[in-house]
Regions:
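Nucleotidyltransferase catalytic core that binds NTPs
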Residues: 2-132
């Protein structure tokens, strides 16, 4: 959605290379490859991984210096991310993380809110998705 794109564009201004990585969640209905990547990622490097994010990052570190970028909308997101970071740092103490805050106009947008809008009325969430 537009909030994710905003964070991605900011990360691309900071880092030489950005890989969008999507974890495969076994708790969700869609299997690997069934949930298509958005068109906005067509010319950007993107990968899916199974297992722990820290393990995925370790495989990437075999070939490059890696920094995990996490997007934030508000203080609630920060609280959640800091808690998650504590777990990840126990598994990977050398983890490097950068938090990037989205622009104000995207603070209210979340994937779950868009999914809920779509359940109510197909196409209702489209206004929060990038137009290409």
């Amino acid at each position: 959605h537009n909030g994710h794109l905003n964070i991605l564009e900011k990360a691309e201004r900071v880092f030489d290379k950005v890989i969008v990585a999507r974890g495969i969640n076994p708790e969700k209905a869609e299997a690997a490859g069934q949930n298509p990547w958005p068109a906005v990622l067509q010319f950007r490097q993107h990968e899916e991984f199974a297992g722990l994010l820290t393990d995925y990052l370790a495989t990437k570190e075999e070939h490059a210096d890696v920094t995990l970028v996490r997007g934030l909308r508000n203080g609630d997101d920060l609280d959640y991310e800091v808690n998650q970071l504590r777990f990840m740092e126990e598994m990977k103490p050398d983890l490097k993380v950068v938090f990037i805050r989205c622009d104000k106009q995207f603070e209210h947008i979340s994937s779950s809110a868009i999914r809920n809008l779509e359940k109510i009325n197909k196409g209702l969430g489209d206004k929060y998705l990038p137009k290409f």
